């Protein structure tokens, strides 16, 4: 993998992370608006519900990113294995040519 490809993948990953962070912030604002209408903003239960909701959203984000990275690793491993098989076949074919 070239340096440029690694940089582009890194920037792409950061961009996706920022989008996910923005989505979490948006969900939090909607949730906080709902909670402020139903609960008092300075009550104990409001703080507890807000903390639990934040933890659940970040847990979902972490699991999603972990799943995506595992799928990418599996795809890269399979591609590397098939490339090695092709190289081995070509070297075997070149070695077994009649002289």
From Swiss-Prot:
Annotated TM spans: 46-66
Stretches assigned to the Intravirion side: 23-45
Major place of residence: virion
Bilayer topology term: Single-pass membrane protein
Compartments where found: Virion membrane; Host cytoplasm
GO CC, one annotated term: host cell cytoplasm
Compositionally biased spans, kind Polar residues: 90-99
Disulphides: none
Bias (Basic and acidic residues): 73-89
Region described as Disordered: 73-99
Virion surface topological segments: 67-83
Function: Envelope protein. Required for an early step in virion morphogenesis.
Name listed for the protein in its UniProt record: Virion membrane protein OPG135
Lineage: Viruses, Varidnaviria, Bamfordvirae, Nucleocytoviricota, Pokkesviricetes
